[in-house]
């Protein structure tokens, strides 16, 4: 029996060598009037998928396209479009911005196999078949004006079909021959079967042998091949995209490839929006943007709102000169939606109540992954020998139990500087939502997947508290750091840490005493001046723990112990005002905190709430005046963690303890910082008010939190839209179209600078990465590089972001940044709320 589709494929392979090719004004290659290749001037490929009876590869294909920030073109028959089992897949094709076009209604053969010039249907029959196909496409919300290209059934046509397609307002396209990709449908028992490996290698061979590589290719694959083929090419699709991406190719829709028009991009919050809050997306392009946009219901694909874009004037981003805000705040109906602006669509998102309620618990997964000691994510223990002392009252090298706590980021160091803040912020997140059901109990105290009757956020905070108590072994003693940058000795899992700090490979690690003096075991000394920064945050965490557990019969003794430790360490801070910075050893990079009055204010305010002792209230007011509005806000450059924490929680916690006059002063401090950020945000089209320094995402979370706290303090809603823009930046409304949290949203950081995920080939949910940095910072840092080509190159501007494991400046998750985002989202649950 003759396999006519295989004969057709061979025909095209032979024809490519002899066809009479014509080139139109934009450099396309034609055969018999149909386009078989786009312009070869750029490294762009149109990935073309056809479907009629099967679709088992569809989900994998769409997932891989999403992973590569790529778009494809899908040509489906009417029978495919009306198959209820395929409807979710088709809706996903549309909602994720891919091209959806016709492939005939019934998959009939239009031209004779042996004599292709012989047409097997009349023009009337062709038109009826095509019209039915187009009608079924429109049922998925695709406007007829957006359907411009037609790929014929069996990829077989003649001049009549080309002409009749044009009469129907469509341009006929077919695959570029020469790669054997179209053979991916053949069954295992077919005598002309081509394995997925051979197809894969054939594509790469053609890329090497063609003078233009695969530039302009229409690379055809089938969305499904049915049960007759077990060697599914979809399983190799991601590998193919990886290989071609590494060679510099971009994957675009067929209309973008052939029309050579600058694309439009739409960026929105990929998680979603509250019913009553501002809802503003951003569209951008190299050229003038469409005047209007529409909001489309992702379930029905019906337009529910149409609006006009508001041009953002006098600002640009990178190569993009045209930006517009797409405001759909009037939509207050719950559902799942996406935005369409011209040919572009956003990633889908939700509108509804409590949109952010699941996120704090999601972010806790990363906190558990960062645990030192017993790590539930790895299911094993690490660093049991932490540690041996340096500086302080004990002989250097004296054993001190500093096990537990959290690894700070992608490395394995542990800092009280960041951990104290993370612990306090998680406790405050719970305290502010004391009666909320949104904090769930999925794990036990060790982080294992079994309940223990305590919300997971308190389990995680308790993990931090237990470690902090170990760092305060006596009333006059406080330790602040375990390990140093000798840790940066190659990639390994925490239990396999081989670093030698002087007590043998993989042995005890150094534990630094907080003496308030410059420290550093080699040439790089810190600029420490005191311990008040550490002490204030320590006291805040311990006093919050007491407030939460003092009436809990099972934990009241622990609460009392925390309060006593908080008082003792607060006294150390009072006696030694100033900052204890992080210590480095081999390089100049360290935590360079210079502020401390804000921390003492917070600690004093929480101690007053815990004890009612007037001295603490007096101290809090004094430190509040000293801290004032000093922060990074409004600055273009600062030292690393110079103004830490990145917002002063102390003003918020003191606010309802003071008289009206002092309340105005505290609110004014917050307002001053926010206004400086608004001014900075006016210089970019996304209204982002933070400097793009190291950990800009942490700054952004802090800014959102300050706006939310200001509103809770005063009832003043003036900053709500500005705060929403900052939050939305973290959730996808940015040039790169990615959230800054792993596994949150449709597109998120995947190749993060984190040893545990890279070495285990697993992903972790909820990690906040550092976020974009100024291009000049990226280029100045030692040891920072990326793999080329950069898939996000088109979207880089004055600030750059790389989803690349080698870029620790923008794509390294931080434990404390993630904890601060937990507080941010906890406030969002009740935002807008009452005081």
Language model features with spans:
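Active-site beta->alpha N-cap acidic-glycine motif
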Residues: 23-118, 131-149, 240-243
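A conserved hydrophobic secondary-structure block that centers on an alpha-helix together
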Residues: 455, 516-569, 576
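Catalytic domains of cell-wall/extracellular-matrix polysaccharide-remodeling enzymes
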Residues: 82-85, 107-220, 224-259
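Bacterial N-terminal signal peptides
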Residues: 8-18
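Acidic, glycine-anchored loop motifs typical of Ca2+
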Residues: 445-453
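Aromatic (Trp/Tyr) and acidic
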Residues: 271-347, 353, 365-424, 428-429, ...
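Structural recognition of the beta-strand scaffold that forms the well-ordered cores
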Residues: 45-48, 72-76, 99-104, 148-152, ...
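Carboxylate/His-rich catalytic cores and anion/metal-binding grooves
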Residues: 456-482
């Amino acid at each position: 029996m003759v396999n006519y589709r295989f004969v057709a494929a061979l025909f095209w392979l032979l024809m490519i060598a002899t066809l009479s090719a014509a080139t139109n004004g934009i450099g396309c290659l034609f055969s018999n009037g149909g386009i078989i290749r786009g312009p070869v001037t750029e490294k762009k490929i149109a990935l073309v998928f056809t479907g009629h009876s099967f679709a088992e590869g569809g989900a994998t294909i769409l997932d891989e396209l999403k992973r590569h920030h790529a778009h494809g073109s899908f040509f489906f028959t009417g029978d495919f479009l009306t198959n209820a089992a395929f409807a979710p897949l088709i809706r996903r094709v549309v909602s994720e911005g891919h091209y959806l076009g016709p492939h005939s209604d019934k998959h009939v053969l239009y031209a004779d196999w042996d004599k292709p010039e012989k047409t097997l249907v009349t023009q009337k029959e062709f038109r009826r078949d095509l019209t039915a196909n187009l009608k079924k496409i429109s049922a998925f919300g695709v406007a007829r004006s957006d359907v411009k290209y037609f790929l014929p059934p069996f990829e077989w046509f003649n001049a009549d079909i080309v002409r009749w397609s044009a009469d129907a307002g469509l341009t006929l396209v077919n695959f570029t021959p020469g790669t054997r990709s179209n053979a991916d449908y053949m069954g295992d028992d077919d005598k002309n079967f081509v394995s997925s490996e051979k197809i894969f290698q054939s594509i790469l061979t053609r890329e090497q042998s063609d003078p233009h590589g695969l530039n302009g290719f229409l690379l055809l694959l089938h969305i499904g091949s049915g049960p007759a083929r077990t060697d599914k090419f979809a399983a190799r699709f991601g590998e193919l995209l990886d290989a071609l991406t590494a060679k510099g190719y971009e994957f675009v829709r067929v209309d973008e490839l052939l029309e050579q028009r600058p694309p439009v991009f739409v960026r929105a919050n990929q998680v979603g929006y509250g019913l009553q809050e501002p809802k503003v997306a951003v569209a951008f392009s190299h050229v003038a943007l469409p005047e209007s946009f529409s909001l489309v219901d992702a379930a029905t694909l019906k337009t529910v709102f149409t609006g006009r874009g508001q041009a953002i004037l006098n600002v640009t981003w990178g190569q993009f000169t045209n930006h517009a805000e797409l405001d759909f705040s009037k939509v207050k109906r719950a559902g799942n939606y996406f935005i369409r602006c011209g040919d572009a669509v956003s990633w889908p998102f939700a509108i509804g109540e409590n949109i952010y309620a699941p996120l704090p618990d999601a972010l806790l997964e990363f906190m558990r992954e960062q645990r030192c000691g017993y790590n539930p994510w790895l299911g094993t223990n690490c660093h049991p020998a932490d540690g041996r002392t340096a500086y302080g009252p004990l002989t250097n090298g004296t054993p001190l139990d500093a096990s537990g706590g959290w690894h700070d980021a992608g490395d394995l160091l542990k800092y009280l500087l960041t951990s104290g803040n993370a612990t306090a912020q998680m406790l405050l997140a719970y305290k502010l939502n004391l009666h909320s059901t949104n904090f769930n109990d999925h794990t036990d105290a060790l982080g294992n997947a079994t309940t223990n009757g305590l919300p997971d956020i308190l389990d995680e905070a308790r993990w931090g508290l237990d470690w902090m108590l170990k760092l305060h072994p006596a009333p006059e003693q406080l330790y602040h750091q375990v390990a140093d940058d000798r840790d940066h000795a190659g990639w390994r899992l925490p239990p396999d840490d081989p670093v030698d700090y002087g007590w043998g490979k993989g042995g005890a690690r150094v534990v630094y005493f907080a003496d308030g003096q410059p420290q550093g075991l080699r040439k790089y000394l810190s600029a420490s001046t005191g311990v008040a920064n550490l002490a204030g945050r320590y006291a805040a965490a311990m006093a919050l723990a007491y407030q939460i557990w003092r009436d809990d019969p099972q934990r009241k003794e622990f609460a009392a112990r925390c309060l006593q430790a908080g008082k003792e360490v607060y006294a150390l801070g009072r006696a030694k005002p100033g900052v204890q910075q992080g210590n480095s050893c081999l390089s100049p990079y360290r935590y360079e905190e210079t502020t401390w009055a804000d921390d003492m204010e917070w600690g004093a305010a929480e101690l007053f709430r815990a004890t009612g002792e007037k001295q603490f209230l007096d101290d809090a007011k004094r430190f509040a005046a000293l801290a004032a509005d000093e922060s990074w806000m409004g600055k273009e450059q600062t030292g690393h963690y110079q103004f830490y924490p990145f917002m002063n929680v102390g003003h918020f916690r003191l606010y309802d303890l003071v008289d009206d006059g002092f309340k105005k002063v505290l609110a004014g401090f917050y307002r001053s910082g926010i206004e400086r950020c608004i001014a900075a945000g006016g210089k970019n089209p996304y209204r982002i008010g933070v400097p793009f320094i190291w950990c800009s995402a942490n700054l952004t979370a802090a800014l959102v939190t300050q706006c939310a706290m200001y509103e809770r303090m005063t009832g003043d809603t003036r900053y709500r839209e500005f705060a929403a823009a900052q939050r939305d930046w973290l959730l996808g409304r940015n040039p790169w179209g990615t959230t800054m949290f792993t596994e949150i949203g449709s597109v998120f950081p995947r190749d993060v600078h984190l040893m545990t995920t890279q070495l285990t080939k697993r992903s972790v949910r909820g990690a906040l990465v550092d976020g974009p940095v100024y291009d000049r910072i990226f280029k100045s840092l030692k040891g920072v590089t990326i793999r080329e080509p950069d898939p996000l190159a088109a979207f880089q501007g004055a600030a750059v972001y790389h989803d690349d494991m080698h870029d620790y400046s923008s794509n390294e998750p931080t434990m404390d940044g993630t904890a601060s985002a937990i507080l941010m989202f906890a406030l969002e649950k009740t935002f807008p709320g009452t005081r």
